[in-house]
Amino acid sequence: MPKYYCEYCDIYLTHSSPVGRRQHVQGRKHISAKIEYFQNLLREEGITPQNFLGFLGPRALNNILGNPMMNNMMPGNFPMHMKHNNMKHHSHYSRRSHRHHMPHGRYGRERHGHYSYSSKYHSHPMHMNSSSMSSMSGFPYNEHSGNFFSLSNSMHGNGKMGNMVIRDLVSNVNIENDLVKDNPNEERNGDSAIANQPSTMHHEEDQDDPANATGGTANNNDNVSINA
């Protein structure tokens, strides 16, 4: 004889195992019989949805509100298994949307290559070495040019500071070139002055020579002595 009796369905279960009872409780016939049982009970007691809370009284109302299972069944709340299912569906949806927005193989690599191309050739235009840049710029590689290119590499050749450094470098190079151009002229002027000094000295000696200066008088004296 079966051990389990269902008072809602008014039957004895042929399988009284936990699995059999769980299947019976979750069945459609048991649920409909349970609803009908409580409807008949409320009708016999004269309980309607309007006077349901007043019929239970304040103590029963407090028990209902204090019961966590009843709180979960209140409007706006859901049982724990429904919450769990909703969270699972939400997580699956978010994962699908995340995969949808992720870049796919070939397009992702192309975008990455495009970004690397722009960062390599546009954001850092001064990655060439300073010696090659100095040979291209037209002035020899020196201390000032090396400092300039190190500064320009640090600033990536952008902004007003880079332009100011370029202007300062050009002005320094022009000043050095002017000094180099002026120094040979000064040396040549000094050489010409030194070369001209002996010539002027010889000219003065010729003018101050007593023999040359009295040459005319000596001849005149000779002539005078001869005439006498």
UniProtKB/Swiss-Prot annotation:
Highest taxon, organism lineage: Eukaryota
Entries under PANTHER family matching the protein: U1 SMALL NUCLEAR RIBONUCLEOPROTEIN C
Compositionally skewed regions (Low complexity) per UniProt: 211-221
SUPFAM superfamilies per record: beta-beta-alpha zinc fingers
One Gene Ontology MF term: zinc ion binding
Zinc fingers, Matrin-type class: 4-36
Subunit-level organization: U1 snRNP is composed of the 7 core Sm proteins B/B', D1, D2, D3, E, F and G that assemble in a heptameric protein ring on the Sm site of the small nuclear RNA to form the core snRNP, and at least 3 U1 snRNP-specific proteins U1-70K, U1-A and U1-C. U1-C interacts with U1 snRNA and the 5' splice-site region of the pre-mRNA.
Known role: Component of the spliceosomal U1 snRNP, which is essential for recognition of the pre-mRNA 5' splice-site and the subsequent assembly of the spliceosome. U1-C is directly involved in initial 5' splice-site recognition for both constitutive and regulated alternative splicing. The interaction with the 5' splice-site seems to precede base-pairing between the pre-mRNA and the U1 snRNA. Stimulates commitment or early (E) complex formation by stabilizing the base pairing of the 5' end of the U1 snRNA and the 5' splice-site region.
Protein's name according to its UniProt entry: U1 small nuclear ribonucleoprotein C
Bias-annotated ranges (Basic and acidic residues): 179-190
Gene Ontology CC terms: commitment complex; U1 snRNP; U2-type prespliceosome
Similarity field: Belongs to the U1 small nuclear ribonucleoprotein C family.
Annotated region described as Disordered, given as residue ranges: 179-228
GO biological process: mRNA 5'-splice site recognition; spliceosomal snRNP assembly
Pfam families: zf-U1
Protein source organism: Plasmodium knowlesi (strain H)
